[in-house]
Amino acid sequence: MRWWGRSAPPSPSTPPGVNPNACLTECSVRPFGFFPREEKRSFITVRGLIIEKIATQWAPPTAFQPGAIGPNWARGWVIEGCTVRDSKCTGISLGKRRDEKDNIWSIDPTKGGAQTYTEIIFSNLRRDWNKNEVGGHHIEGNHIYNCGQAGIVGCMGAAFSTIARNVIHDINVRGEFTGAEMSAIKLHCAIDVAIEHNLLFRSVRGLWLDWEAQGARVTRNAFFENQTEDLFIEVCHGPTTVDHNLFLSCRSFLNVSQGTALVHNLFAGEISMHPDTSRFTMYHFPHDTFIAGSIFIYGGDDRVLNNLFIGNGQENCGTAVYEGYRDAEQGVARTTSDCPTAYADNTFPVHIRGNLCLNGARRWSGEPESSQQPDAAAWSVTEENGAFYLGLQLPASAYAATASLVTTETLGKAFESEAAYENTDGTPFALDTDYNCNKRSGSTLPGPFAVPTTHIRLTPEGM
């Protein structure tokens, strides 16, 4: 299949290298598949539809975000069991409404993009961006593929939603677009969003959480064969919880945030991180859209607990990427200053315990030597009867290691937001359910599996 796009030309136009009279040719001009014309058409269920071949337009976070299907700034939609494919840009949009400041950075670039984005956040807070009127959608069991920009996109409008058991693949694999909005799932302001048990593979990127993913939880997802990172968390202050995931691409995680809890994951690729002291980014009151403050991303304030790292021959595998960060038990090394730039080179301390590094993955020097073992591990992803499986062979040392159960009390609070790592309803949690839904006890294994296993289904059941 070949894609070719063209605005309505004044004269006939032919795709290069193709005779449209000698092959199947389809022209898509429909901008939406299932998308209300008006805002606030809330509490609609869409189940079992095939939505395909939609000529969707670009969906940036600073303008109206169209999609093949979406609620258009509403509350409480259920999109379940649908097939969404061959959308020029985005499959499912949970994104931003039309706004008087749409694309203002392109129209008048005298203010930077981060500043105009911040203004858009405040203008929508003044109008109706709150938990009672927008968001809270349930997106489950959908098959989304062959989209040019994103499988699921959403700025502000995805807050308080659940995205579960979806299979998303082949997103932007043709490279028809470049820029900062391409991913299987790309969300801004993913406040209290639960992203659970999805399979995201063979895309330009797996999951990208950008700005204000406060209270989000990423749990029991599988990623493989993604071109850049499986997971990118950008300029978020935390708390963000990432637990029991399988990161199997060459690059597992890009961390340009702070206050992230990485617990009981399998990382089979590189990890990279850096602060961002070039722009002020916002944090919120717990479980709310209301802004509590704004500050730089200094880096650190992470909790890296009970993960399994399998090296892939690259240098940045394992917890050693945190070398130079202070241990949280040493406290925050700061003196009082009213100048945010005074701390630009002073990262927050981190809490790193209970991890196991294999296959050349290297430990952070603050961890005991036993957390790094020379033993080899092997894994592969195969397809069987239309479903994907992980084959995993771990050495005996992986089953000899022990780790403690992680709870809300263990994780504490993120520094800037002063918000706890907890359920979206504000109740405490225990990260005691592994990738296969087995329960953990007080002493458990590092990594995503509470019991030894060698054959793991990645495709959600029923998909």
Each predicted region: which residue ranges?
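N-terminal presequences and immediately downstream first alpha-helices
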Residues: 1-2, 163
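Surface beta-loop-beta hairpin patches that serve as ligand-binding interfaces in beta-rich domains
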Residues: 3-17, 332-463
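Extracellular beta-strand-rich solenoid/capping regions of secreted or surface-exposed proteins
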Residues: 7, 27-45, 61-74
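A mature extracytoplasmic/lumenal domain signature
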Residues: 15-17, 50, 96
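Small/polar beta-strand repeat architecture
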Residues: 16-31
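Linear-motif-rich, low-complexity cytosolic tails and juxtamembrane regions
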Residues: 33-40, 45, 52-53, 58-60, ...
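Glycine- and acidic/polar-rich repeat regions and solenoidal domains
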Residues: 34, 56-72, 85-404
